[in-house]
Amino acid sequence: TRAIRGVRSYPSMLDVPDEVDLAVVIVPAPAVPNVVGQLGERGVKGAVIISAGFKETGAAGAKLEADTVAIAHQYNIALVGPNCLGVINTDPEVRLNASFAKGTPAAGNIAFISQSGALATAVLDYAKGQDFGFSKVVSLGNKADVNENDFLYHLWHDPDTRVILLYLEDLADGGE
């Protein structure tokens, strides 16, 4: 193993000796399906795909995204993204920042779901100087697998969330 800025790193998911609950994938888009396959072989059940270069780029990217989702479904992996900022949970028992946001926001009772990573970043930056915080922050990106309906259901039942902010560019399944 090697270390990057003091953190152990591995050349492949298959080389990681520990159990992995959630993977944050930030590799070039063409490498994502292979990485998701490795996650499946390791039994990982959740992944945040931050990488861009999927359906937002056209037909070839859309096929790459569909292939990635098919591999994830084969292994029962829930995917957030691709092309997203990531996810944040401010619960002190969890304290997860699986994103490339600059820092973790203050804890609060507002959940924020945004399809746009740029808007999520702007809202998080604005919130730093204000008197409110977030319970959860989710950037959906392309919504290739997990979508706003999945998160809305979870957040509706989340005791740490009293308000849900939502920014969407489209609805995954309006009838749901």
Name what the model sees in each region.
Residues T1-E176:
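Catalytic-core regions of core metabolic enzymes
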